[in-house]
Amino acid sequence: MTSYQSQLGEGEGIAEELAESQRAISIAEFFEKNKHMLGFDSEARALVTAVKEAVDNALDACEEAGILPDIYVEIQESGDYYKLVVEDNGPGITKEQAPKIFGKLLYGSRFHAREQNRGQQGIGISAAVLYSQLTSGKPAKITSRPKGQDEAQYFELIVDTDTNEPEISVDETTTWERPHGTRIELEMEANMRARSTLRDYIQDTAVVNPHARVEFDEPGLDESLKFERAERAELPDETEEIRPHPHGVELGTLLKMLEATDSYSVSGFMQEEFTRVGGKTADSVIANFNDRHYGRGMAWQPPKVNEDADIERAVEDAVANKGAETTATFAAAVSDAIHDRDRVAYHEVESIVDSAAEDAEADGDTTFGATVRENAVDAAWNAVSDNLSSDLYALVDDVTTKRKDDAAVEGLASRLADKFDDDGRHRLTRDELRGYIDRAADMTEEQDDATFGETARENVLEALWTAAEGVREEPPKVSDIADDRDTASQLLSAMRETDIIAPPTDCLSPISAELVEEGLRKEFDADFYAASTRDASVHGGDPFIVEAGIAYGGELESEGTVDVMRFANRVPLVYQRGACATTDVVKSIRWRNYNLDQPGGSGIPKGPAVIMVHVASTNVPFTSESKDAIANVPEMEDEIELAIREAARELKSYLNKRRSMQQRREKQDKLATILPEMAEKLTEVTDNDELHIDDSLARIMNNVLVEREVEDDTVRVRIENNDDTNADVELTDIVTAEPQVTNGATVVEMDGEWFVKWSPTVGAGETAVLEYSVTDEAEFTVSVDGIEEEKLTVNA
């Protein structure tokens, strides 16, 4: 069959024709044809995405300027289109910057910043402008008044998709009632089918940004929805930009950093360009790099003094024309220094010889030149490495199983010794050493019918590599590493292997457990709230913090599954719920252990609850450009699970206690029915006065009993603790006449009533008495706090 390429080849100049048809495209033109990648894949979702991008911009602008956000969002019907209006009270945007911020994709100030941000790429709001102009043909209308200026600037613009530059049709000044801030108005093809999602997004934004006030209006509302900021809420802590962490860079990034740095040495480069790298850490990186670049020198046990391979005699024989006494002293010094070590490598022998030579030169007129020293090194090293088989046998035998017979171990050791004869210095990398072991093991299996599996080979490798000594060579200059991709790759591997402190967390601004709970309280009417904030962890060199919150009961919907709220860097994630790591973690938890209904033992639990999870990071691993879901990163999933479980344990305690109180209440109700009947029967039988059952009920139920006794002008309030734990009681006795307090209570007068406040701690089985006097007739009303209603009996 004739190929397309052969058909092309039949014509002359076809390559030139094809070349003429090829051209570069701008990023704006690319996204013009791929709107779905940014979250504009349907009319319903497009409106939600546009609101999200505009609100994110508003929140970021306010927080960066230190202004508590006040944001207004309005959606209007405008003929065949919908009009979106978003206003904020931020610092405003300068005349020069506003067109680029709204009309140029990939224009932003935070792309290179390693700190927590809602957005970084500079795509979001300009993508909304692009979608608006593509679907309605109308420009974006922007009004911005920088703080301190008398007038606002008004623009109408579109994105020129050929050049990715703003095309401004209107540029004028105008008046605006806001003292500072920004307003954007977009018309677009959209629909309100995602109305509930849109409202959820606004509410979720209010939950996770309790410091913000948000007002939302849409068609069909009688009045706008207002989400007030939480009391005591303050702006999030300012974040600090950090340098990259050595564990978080890729090879291409490292090469760029090597080319751009002003440092000449690897040590200086590591300390200047990376966070958490000081002198000692840089030395560790260099040591690991040298292992890869130069290799390690195998270190062998020195021969015993009386063995044939006598180091002292070998060095004496190698040194000529230095005088017998000087030579003997020099040789003895070399031999003693080598024998002082358990193992010695070639480069260490070089150092020993140099040191002994310098001492000999200092003691006399003899000079030990380079040739003499080299001869001495070779002689000493040959004596050290004369019989490697026995040394290797001991190393191999120590890490292989007892099932390996001596012949097999000896065979492997002998063949390894032969491999080292090929390199006089016995210097090699870990991979080269692995190759030695594999070839020697293969030959041993083939010739000696012995088996050395992967585990045995790995154990031998580890033993020999541990016995080897790192070389003390200066690493190449930074410029040389930048020019050699393989060397740069060795440096990257060394960085990743080195144990380095996790990056600092001042680049992050978590919400805090207190404000997570406050946000939930503000938006959900529930009976129980709990929240947790984990310590910082690291993924790929980027720090992250996970926070979780749970609300339960109250007015929350009891039918169906619980509501799972997902957030990343204070932004709600409203789409791709099923593709998100947060959802996967929630499904994987056995919620029955926390007293929530979970049919089948897996999946989203059922019940009146809200589970929220917030991930704060300098680099959230989203699954796509639209930032709808968090990727399944094991380190992040682990922290999400731990944060949820921390809050869920509080929920379990609450539900257990509630169940216990319910059972106690049911028991108490039954006793309250039975005891009066028993008391009545006893009264009839004994002809005694009617029995008071409140005291008896309190003692049977182990309750805290509060009783009042009034005798003449004296009032006694008695607290009897029938429980087996201390009771911290907050008692307020409201009296209509002025009391005279005698035992430490405080009195506050208000509107002709006196509030006697008493806060005793009553031990288990003990009684405390508040006594005071009133000179006039009075009425009394007692209020008790600090004790659960089910554990309290009041007869006062």
Swiss-Prot record:
It catalyses: ATP-dependent breakage, passage and rejoining of double-stranded DNA. GO terms for molecular function: ATP binding; DNA binding; DNA topoisomerase type II (double strand cut, ATP-hydrolyzing) activity. Keywords: ATP-binding, DNA-binding, Isomerase, Nucleotide-binding, Topoisomerase. Pfam families: HATPase_c, Top6b_C, Topo-VIb_trans. InterPro entries: HATPase_C_sf, Ribosomal_Su5_D2-typ_SF, Ribsml_uS5_D2-typ_fold_subgr, Top6b_C, TopoVI_B, TopoVI_B_transducer. NCBIfam families: PRK04184.1, PRK14868.1, top6b. Relaxes both positive and negative superturns and exhibits a strong decatenase activity. This is Type 2 DNA topoisomerase 6 subunit B. It comes from Haloarcula marismortui (strain ATCC 43049 / DSM 3752 / JCM 8966 / VKM B-1809).
